From Swiss-Prot:
Family that this chain belongs to: Belongs to the CbiM family.
UniProt-listed InterPro entries: CbiM, CbiM/NikMN
Secretion signal span: 1-26
Organism: Lachnoclostridium phytofermentans (strain ATCC 700394 / DSM 18823 / ISDg)
Keyword Membrane: yes
The protein, known as: Cobalt transport protein CbiM
Length: 250
């Protein structure tokens, strides 16, 4: 590794030490066996096209910019660390940061689908977070829906000439919240309310998630901004390869 790559690895390691050390808890996104089989299969099938697009997106990026491999790994580590810090919220689920906004900004939302599913598989097998039967649902909410919204918000802020740091914050913040909107809908579809159906059930899940998820989304937005500032300082060449330093971060 050259000097800049070592600095990037050092930043990622320091971040993991600061935020990744936490007591082991039996928490997860949507836990193993919680969704009926038909919903597990449906969400898995819906995720497949995005994963295929993500594979080709990463392949194209790496073939054109070999230096991007380190940053791609760092974006994956960011997702792993943040999404492993969980706060129990409702039965069968929990609240946590997602970390996917950073990868969406750097590499686009399709690439993050691959990073996300890798993280979810590791968490399901090694940490007992989430599950293999609910992998499709968790992938769709955290690794697909959230990143696409984050990317859209970031591009919209660019078009509206919003301050770059503010745009990064909003992208991570809104993407995190949207992930939980999708999760609430997934849970509501599987367990509709006896009074009011899916809509009423979704509102109930959202109401329970909100007190913990809104503060976590704010924290994720701030952390994403801090990481981007660090990358602008120590990995400007890599960001330039990805077309992200026009005018600098201001």
């Amino acid at each position: 590794m050259n000097k800049k790559e070592k600095r990037i690895v050092a930043i990622a390691a320091a971040f993991a030490l600061c935020f990744g050390i936490s007591p082991a808890v039996n928490a997860m996104h949507i836990m193993e066996g919680y969704l009926p089989p038909k919903y597990c299969i449906t969400w898995g099938i819906l995720s497949i096209p995005f994963l295929v697009a993500g594979y080709f997106s990463i392949k194209k990026t790496v073939s054109k910019q070999h230096r991007s491999i380190t940053m791609l790994a760092m974006a994956g580590a960011f997702v792993f660390v943040l999404s492993s810090l969980k706060i129990p919220s409702v039965t069968g689920s929990c609240s946590h940061m997602t970390g996917t906004g950073l990868g969406a900004i750097l590499f686009g939302p399709s690439a993050v689908s691959i990073l996300g599913i890798i993280v979810l598989i590791f968490q399901a097998i090694l940490l007992a977070h989430g599950g293999l039967t609910t992998l499709g649902a968790n992938t769709f909410s955290m690794a697909i829906a959230g990143p696409f919204v984050s990317f859209g918000i970031y591009k919209l802020c660019q078009k509206l000439k919003v301050n770059k740091l503010s745009g990064i914050f909003l992208a991570a913040f809104v993407g995190d919240l949207f992930t939980y909107c999708v999760t609430s809908i997934q849970l509501a579809l599987a367990y509709p309310s006896s009074n009011g159906g899916v809509g009423a059930s979704a509102l109930k899940f959202l109401a329970v998630f909100a007190p913990t998820q809104v503060p976590l989304a704010i924290i994720e937005g701030i952390l994403t901004v801090v990481i981007m500032i660090g990358l602008e300082t120590y990995a400007k060449a890599e960001l330039n390869d990805l077309g992200l330093v026009n005018g600098g971060i201001n």
